[in-house]
Amino acid sequence: TATRGSRKEFPAVAVIVAESTQLTIYDGDDPDMPMWMVFDLLGTVGSNSNMLPRGGSGQESDITSIDFLNSKLVVGLNDVNGTVGEGLVEVNFISDFGRVYREAGSGYTSAIYNLPVSGRNSNSSYSGDYDSLAIITQTINDVAMTVLPNAPIDSATGLPVPTIAVA
């Protein structure tokens, strides 16, 4: 399809390209580097949106930063007009879910996308509001991940849980 390549398994070498309103993962295992998966930004957290939300009219968010480690893709979003962005989105490819991190009290803080990764561009919605997992601001300029020594092991993946730094 236009947003999903023919290979099922995640490539050992992935090239991830972020444009302002689209994120594309290319299969670096293949010398032709075909598209493996595309995420389109659409909609607003709190109403219908894709797994990567774009934001409402006049408050559109662009991708500012990405990182990938241990099956987790994190995407930072920042409002193009300087107001509050849509936050930080985590996509977990092994556990097959998306989660958005936002400010406490913003509604939908650490909410889970209602569809698996295969439904990432389906204009669904997020559910839940967990202020205990809030971030300081929804305006994301940069993101990085690392696995710290003695990091806990994710029981679903068997991989160490990365620490996510957000600026």
Regions found by a protein language model. Name each.
Residues A12-V17, S71-G82, P162-A167:
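Short beta-strand elements that form the blades of beta-propeller/WD-repeat-like
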Residues T1-P11, M51-S71, G128-V161:
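Structural signature of eukaryotic scaffold interfaces centered on beta-propeller domains
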Residues E19-W36, V80-S95:
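Structural motif
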Residues T1-D29:
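Non-catalytic protein-protein interaction scaffold segments in large eukaryotic complex-forming proteins
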Residues D29-Q59, I94-A144:
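Surface-exposed loop and turn segments in beta-propeller and other repeat-based domains
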Residues V15, L23, I66, L73-V75, ...:
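Generic structural hydrophobic/aromatic packing signal, biased to beta-strands
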Residues V74-D79, R99, D154-A156:
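Generic local-structure boundary detector
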